[in-house]
């Protein structure tokens, strides 16, 4: 819907932790860099001079060695950044753009693991892009075109159906998500 000129479906915005499964875990799981049982150190990635440990987790603590499964379930910032750095922020960027069809990411995003790891993108991503990515995970790794709903001036809903499916290679990620 459009609210005061802002289209919540098509305008890019910052999604933060909601992008971790898509920007960090999906690419690394998909190519075998990590598995659900891989151990990741839940410990600050670096000490920012004058600011302390970075990143911090929402619960303000650290678990030490933990599995990808736990890191994803607990939305651990430290682990997301570590996975993104080991996979590579440029590779994560390419995965999101080439496999998932994200169009609002910038080259600057591809150079910053903190941004890619925690969802603080240069411009942001759209609700349409996020919905399509999560739908592919839920659909065993197959992405369908977006089916927007339009409302005509007389109030009738018009569904624009997309045709065909494109495999995006999320079968491993989809299987992991089904375990939840």
Q: What positions do the PLM features span?
A:
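Short, glycine-/Ser/Thr-/acidic-enriched flexible segments
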Residues: 1, 29-31, 76-78, 123, ...
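Short, charged, amphipathic alpha-helices and their helix-cap/turn boundaries
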Residues: 88-105
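Active-site-proximal helix/loop microenvironment
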Residues: 12, 18, 103-159
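A short, well-structured edge-of-sheet supersecondary motif
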Residues: 1-2, 150
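Conserved catalytic neighborhood of penicillin-recognizing serine enzymes
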Residues: 34-92, 139, 143, 155-180
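Catalytic-loop motifs flanking and including active-site residues across diverse enzymes
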Residues: 19-24, 76-79, 126-130
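Active-site SXXK
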Residues: 14-40, 71, 133-137
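A short, polar/charged loop-to-alpha-helix boundary motif
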Residues: 2-14
